Amino acid sequence: MTENSAVEVDEGVFESTAVIDNGSFGTRTIRFETGRLAQQAAGAVVAYLDDETMLLSATSASKHPKEHFDFFPLTVDVEERMYAAGRIPGSFFRREGRPSTDAILTCRLIDRPLRPSFVDGLRNEIQVVVTVMSLNPQDLYDVVAINAASASTQIAGLPFSGPVGGVRVALITSDENKAGQWVAFPTVEQLENAVFDMVVAGRIVSGSGDDADVAIMMVEAEATDNVISLIDGGAQAPTETIVAEGLEAAKPFIARLCTAQQQLAVKAAKPTGDFPVFPAYQDDVFAAVEAAAAEKLSAALTIAGKQERDDKTDEVKVEVLEQVAPNFEGREKELGAAFRSLTKKLVRQRILRDQFRIDGRGITDIRSLSAEVAIVPRAHGSALFERGETQILGVTTLDMVKMAQQVDSLGPETTKRYMHHYNFPPYSTGETGRVGSPKRREIGHGALAERALMPVLPSVEEFPYAIRQVSEALSSNGSTSMGSVCASTLALLNAGVPLKAPVAGIAMGLVSDQVDGETRYVALTDILGAEDAFGDMDFKVAGTKDFVTALQLDTKLDGIPSKVLAGALSQAKDARATILEVMAEAIDTPDEMSPFAPRVTAIKVPVDKIGEVIGPKGKMINSITEQTGANISIEDDGTVFVGATDGPSAQAAIDMINAIANPQLPKVGERFLGTVVKTTAFGAFVSLLPGRDGLVHISKLGSGKRIAKVEDVVSVGSKLRVEIADIDNRGKISLIPVEEDGAAAPAEQSEEAAAEK
């Protein structure tokens, strides 16, 4: 990495630059500029990635605090402008409307590391608005947005302990380097060869330059959709050890980005304003509450059941507050906050000193597990997963591929065949509240569960269905998102979806403090809701028995030792294995598809026959639909998806389509003298008839011997005598070579002779 710089490029306009060196993968340049745009905002920074991707971040603050608030009113908004990609919005009014899922998830990525960086007790409203103004289609803007938001906040004169640096690192493999290299700010094209991809945010806690000590604050990570095929090709699997290495690899990049922001702040930051802070309570209030409640509350916190424990804790709270309230008139809110702080202190003390938790478990114990499938009668697939008092219902729905979600955002994804929706109704925690459209938290949890399962889903060729997975959090006491991963795996298998491997998830926690003069860290397996709230880290890990598929980390600490993090990952792997065993007892292979699910078959027709299948004004395809009752969807490449409620209806539609588009279907056993038209790593495509090709797999080309490359035996243009070994229900033809002198009559048919028929 080269040195950063901060210069005045015009009167009052300053910029700084961070150059990220990825070795053989090239360099990426992040440039921060302030003083030109949005000058009335408290802080405004334009961030560029290689001068083509451009984001404006503006930070504003209210002049007066909201004294009646008992929380920090920070709002983060991401505005995707379609002009950034040279497009007009597809909505009816042709302008941007509600934020896309990508924008909402980016808001969460920004909020999570920024919020803990503000001083405790701040009650002024702070708003950060990031506008995507230009986007190279090969770039992902979310990590650029993290840096832009941090930079604009850093110069806004706020009590902010930044800057925060954010980087996406991907483990990209190649034929020469199967172990892979961690590449910062990878392009969309480079991610196709990545086995793991993570967004990491952090800040410098000591030192400077690339060797600065960086504290990781937030991680959002996932295995890529291609991970299993890449592993099969010899690539490194993203195990817990590899993930830990990736976090370390991200730190120098974060240091570089933070340094660039610091240098910009030196030139352009406003002096920190006088912002009043409102501590949750004063020391005298805490001392009084502790003296009155410590003994009774300690006893209440040993009750294992959540409901009974909460009831007893509430009883103690009412009793104690009545006892001490006369001494603190007008400070009732402080009393409640002090009681909560005392609860946190006692919970943490028991974990650190006794290695026991509030429900009586040891630090590595998992709550009781239960898994059951086929819960909802007419659903295509359903399952109920329970872990202690957390209960998740997973429901799977299958439909035609044309029902895939159309995505109108700035991201590279235009359709989603697999959709995961997570619902968290208020009754799941025994409370009342608003129900309706999903909140940001629900969207984020659904996206995490979706990413955990994407690597193991079958391709559209293997399973030609659109899949909607819904996770209903019926009862919550810790990590409903990871419970959703488990319930979804069970429901998908119950629906007959051929997953490449089952996936389970577990939530980890961390508690640390000074004990006997040393910093002691205790990692907790399967955390409760209270342990999440009172702990120092929320660490969710999902994966198969062999590798990690998704990971999410948020920490309140200024850095977690690598050894502690590695230990937590190891604990998570052990817990995942235990959960997978319980899930396998409920279902371990795909069930038969539900009679209520549509039967979808994919067949192939020549592209020049698509018009004939559709017919003038859709007459032919409508006729087939009316006669058979099947739904038919035709793709531009000639793939036809036929869906029906029963097999005979689908087959009738397929026969009618083939009668139009494939009138001369070859049969198994026929032989041809064909021409090799394409070679790939797995075989050679041979033209048999006009518009009709078949595949000779590489394993069939060596006359019984193993060959390294297809081109060692045949090349494009070669004549090859072949026999049809199989034709699948999609019309794909599998071929085997045959000897010249053993050819039967059909083998005398050359491609040219067949064309004359």
From Swiss-Prot:
GO terms for biological process: mRNA catabolic process; RNA processing. Residues 669-738 form the S1 motif domain. Mg(2+) binds at residues 532, 538. One of its GO terms (molecular function) is RNA binding. SMART domains: KH (SM00322), S1 (SM00316). PROSITE patterns: KH_TYPE_1, S1. Pfam families: KH_1, PNPase, RNase_PH, S1. Keywords: Cytoplasm, Magnesium, Metal-binding, Nucleotidyltransferase, RNA-binding, Transferase. This is Polyribonucleotide nucleotidyltransferase. It comes from Rhodococcus opacus (strain B4). The gene is pnp.
